[in-house]
From Swiss-Prot:
Lineage start: Bacteria, Pseudomonadati, Pseudomonadota, Gammaproteobacteria, Pasteurellales
A Pfam family recorded for this sequence: YidD
Annotated compartments: Cell inner membrane
The protein's role, per its UniProt record: Could be involved in insertion of integral membrane proteins into the membrane.
Disulfide partners: none
Signal peptide: none
Organism domain of life: Bacteria
Originating organism: Histophilus somni (strain 2336) (Haemophilus somnus)
Protein name: Putative membrane protein insertion efficiency factor
């Protein structure tokens, strides 16, 4: 089931998609992680929204460098801190 995303989320996801289609093919595969940083960014924004998703993506991109071995690094799940269920 497709969920509705905010305008900001759609813009950010669109920018990442443009990067994937136009820039990434020119520079080649460089990401050390699975999923790639751009896929991670899309998943993070869809899961956590624009603010937290952007923050998670920036942290991930800063980890993606030659001195980090990389590997499997999924988007953390959204934790529901709803106190009404207690």
């Amino acid at each position: 089931m497709e969920t509705s995303h905010s305008f900001g989320a759609k813009v950010l996801i669109g920018a990442i998609r443009i990067y994937q289609l136009m820039i990434s093919p020119l520079i080649g595969p460089r990401c050390r992680f699975v999923p790639t940083c751009s896929c991670y960014g899309i998943q993070a924004v869809k899961t956590h929204g624009v603010v937290k998703g952007s923050w998670l993506t920036v942290k991930r991109i800063l980890k993606c460098h030659p001195f980090n071995v990389g590997g499997y690094d999924p988007v953390p799940p959204k934790i529901n801190n709803n106190k009404e269920n207690e």
